[in-house]
């Protein structure tokens, strides 16, 4: 609100009488999964406590085009001033929830139980909200940041001098119950990681044939697997069929199209 309103909404204040009371409704203009209603409501609570915001659906619900998702009443100035920020929350987060749900639906076509994960590829200061939207769409949150799980990537491995050295250093420093995951790009790296022992192996940019081989090796050692890299709606079902436990998708948060949602004054 500080960023958008600044010293005041000079357009609304010039045109709308201060004592004008109005009503409005927020409508979904396309089918999708809703997320962000609490933030939209909070926008108006902070802006003007006289505004009444009533959610007509819940976050995580699928709506059709034309569905009224919220009704607003109160000072007209406040309704108009908060419109853009409230819609920004709803459109962006509902877009993430909707895309996540599409990936979940595609991956569910196979018998294997697989979880769709988000990543750290989020907008600065939006991570909590964007990961919440992923959950609303049926996805599962990966680590929240660099502090709650160890994920050894290719650059860590390069600096450490190899997978074995990187894993051993991580194991020596890791606190109890902190998950240790390592990235592997080829079968030889998978075998090396299995030999040393980790909680999960991230199978990065592997083709389907290699994924199947890697998953089979990991299952024998009871190590969880996560497929990542190049995942899209066309290939996610095939990736799920390999038997991986998780599929992480950066596009959920960095490439989701905003859901078309509008606020209409009554």
Description of each model-found segment:
Residues 233:
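Cys/His-rich Zn2+-binding cysteine-cluster or related metal-binding knuckle/ribbon modules and their
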Residues 1-185, 189-196, 200, 209-217, ...:
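Acidic/glycine-rich phosphate/pyrophosphate-binding loops and surrounding catalytic core
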Residues 262-266:
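Active-site loop ensemble at the mouth of alpha/beta enzyme cores that anchors a bound cofactor
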Residues 205, 229, 251-252:
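Short secondary-structure boundary segments
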């Amino acid at each position: 609100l500080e960023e958008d309103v600044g010293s005041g909404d000079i357009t609304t204040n010039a045109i709308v009488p201060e004592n004008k009371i109005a009503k409005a409704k927020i409508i979904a203009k396309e089918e999708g999964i809703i997320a962000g209603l609490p933030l939209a409501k909070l926008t108006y609570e902070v802006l003007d406590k006289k505004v009444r915001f009533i959610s007509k659906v819940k976050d995580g619900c699928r709506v059709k085009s034309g569905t009224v998702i919220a009704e607003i009443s109160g000072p007209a100035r406040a309704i108009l001033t908060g419109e853009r920020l409230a819609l920004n929350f709803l459109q962006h987060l509902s877009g993430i929830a909707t895309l996540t749900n599409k990936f979940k639906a595609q991956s569910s076509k196979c018998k294997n139980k697989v979880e769709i994960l988000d990543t750290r590829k989020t907008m600065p200061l939006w991570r909590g909200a964007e990961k919440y939207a992923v959950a609303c769409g049926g996805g599962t949150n990966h680590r929240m940041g660099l502090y709650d799980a160890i994920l050894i990537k290719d650059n860590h491995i390069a600096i450490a001098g190899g997978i074995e050295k990187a894993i051993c250093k991580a194991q020596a420093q890791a606190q109890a119950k902190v998950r240790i995951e390592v990235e592997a790009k080829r079968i030889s790296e998978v075998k090396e990681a299995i030999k040393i022992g980790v909680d999960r192996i991230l199978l990065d940019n592997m083709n389907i044939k290699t994924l199947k081989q890697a998953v089979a090796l990991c299952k024998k050692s009871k190590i969880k697997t996560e497929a990542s890299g190049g995942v899209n709606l066309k290939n996610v079902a095939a990736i799920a069929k390999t038997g991986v436990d998780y599929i992480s998708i950066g596009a959920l948060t960095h490439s989701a199209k905003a859901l078309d949602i509008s606020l209409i004054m009554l």
